[in-house]
Amino acid sequence: MDISSIVQTIAVYAIPLIFAITIHETAHGYVAKLCGDQTAYMLGRLTLNPIKHIDPVGTILVPGALLIGSALSGMSGIVFGWAKPVPINFRNLRNPKTDMIWVAAAGPGANLIQAILWTIALKILISMGIYEDFFIKMCVAGVSCNIVLMALNLIPIPPLDGGRIVTGLLPPGMAWQNLYPTLTAAAGEIRSVKSASPTV
C-alpha cells in the first residue's frame, strides 16, 4: 500500500476519533458540574477544543500505530484511543454514590449519541445519492470508533466507566469488594516493576 493510501486512512479516522474522545471526556466533566463538582470547569477542561484533551500516547501514538498497521496489512481493524481524563472530585458531588453513576455513564452515552449521529449522516449521504468514498468511509469510521470506545469503557472494571457504574450501583460493602481486587492487582504490578528495576 502506498503512502497516499496510508494518509487517506489516517485522514478518514482522524476527525471521528478526535470528536469521539473529546466529547467523551467533556461529557464527564459537564455532568460532574451539573452534579456539583466544578473541578473540570475551573481547570478549563469543559471545552470541545481537542488540544485541551490530547494525550500524546492515547490520542496520537496508539491510534496512529493501529491505523498504519491496518493500512499496511490491507485489512480493516479496530481503531481506538483515549484522551487525558477530565479531573473529577467525587467528594464534591451532591450525592457521590448516585451521581458517580451519571458522571461515569455520560462518556459512553456521548459515544452512543455520536454513533447514532454518524449513522444518520451516512443515511443522508446515501439518500442524496452522494457516494464519495472519503465521506462514506468517514461516517463508517465515526460509527465504529464510538461503538468501540463505548464498549471498552463499559467493561465493569475500575477505573473504567463501567467499573464506576457498577461501584455506584452496588451496596457499599460489595462496591469495595468490586474495587479491591483491581487495586490489589495494580499494586502488585507496581511492586513487580519496582523489583525488576535496576538499582541506581
Label for each model-derived stretch:
Residues 1-200:
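Hydrophobic transmembrane alpha-helices and their immediate loop junctions
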